[in-house]
Regions:
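Glycine-rich phosphate/pyrophosphate-handling loop used in enzymes and phosphotransfer proteins
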Residues: 1-215
Length: 215
């Protein structure tokens, strides 16, 4: 009887896929749902201030849900899956290279509300998967900016002006890889690149999980 009871509890409380609700694999994102994520062509997506920007995946339903769940719905264990998706894409461009990974920072007020910076979590998993070095102290967000998604390109740049502060003492001397979840106009990457170049850091590459221009 006790064995039946524990099996019943396992059915109720076993971890379910956040996407299809299957408990077969007892993971947050089952292999079928992960495999449904589609990569963009493996090439440079755009150039910002002379720096290469790569966008890993098509802005599909599952990738949107993955990012939003991690970012807004306290699904912190989804960070591994986003990091894995990005790492598997980026390995095609980074053979024999070592990067200093810098996640896009969020303001302390927003981090307090969310309980974490989702891109720091992604950065930790990304570096664990790739062997790169994580640096969350090089760039700090000192301005609590408005959400970018409803703003035009010019408004985004104005909104981000003065948003970031660089701590040069925290630079470890490596090639910088800035990572973010979504690259729309590229304004966030551009502002961070500008600030890094002001202190002489010019060896920079950017990587986002997706861009809404490909759905």
């Amino acid at each position: 009887m006790l064995g039946i009871f524990y099996k019943f509890l396992d059915l109720i409380y076993r971890k379910k896929c956040y996407f299809c609700k299957s408990s077969k694999e007892a993971v947050k994102m089952c292999s079928n749902c992960f495999d449904e994520l589609d990569y963009l062509p493996r090439k440079i997506n755009r150039i910002i201030n002379g720096k290469k920007v790569y966008c890993a995946g098509i802005y599909s339903k599952n990738l949107q849900k993955l990012i939003r769940g991690l970012k807004y719905h306290k699904q912190s264990d989804l960070a591994y899956y986003l990091a894995r998706f990005m790492a598997e894409y980026f390995k095609n461009f980074s053979e024999n290279e070592v990067f200093e990974v810098v996640p896009v920072p969020i303001h302390s007020k927003r981090e307090k509300k969310r309980k974490y910076n989702h891109m720091n979590l992604v950065g930790e998993e990304f570096c664990r998967l790739t062997g790169y070095c994580l640096n969350t102290e090089l760039i700090k967000r000192v301005k609590d900016t408005k959400p970018q998604y409803n703003l035009k390109k010019s408004e985004r740049m104005k909104n981000l002006n003065g948003a970031f502060e660089i701590n040069k003492d925290k630079y470890k001397g490596g090639k910088i890889l800035i990572i973010d979840d979504i690259c729309t106009t590229g304004s966030t990457f551009e502002e961070m690149i500008n600030e890094l170049e002001k202190i002489g850091i010019t060896n920079i590459v950017c990587l986002s999980a997706t861009t809404p221009f490909f759905t």
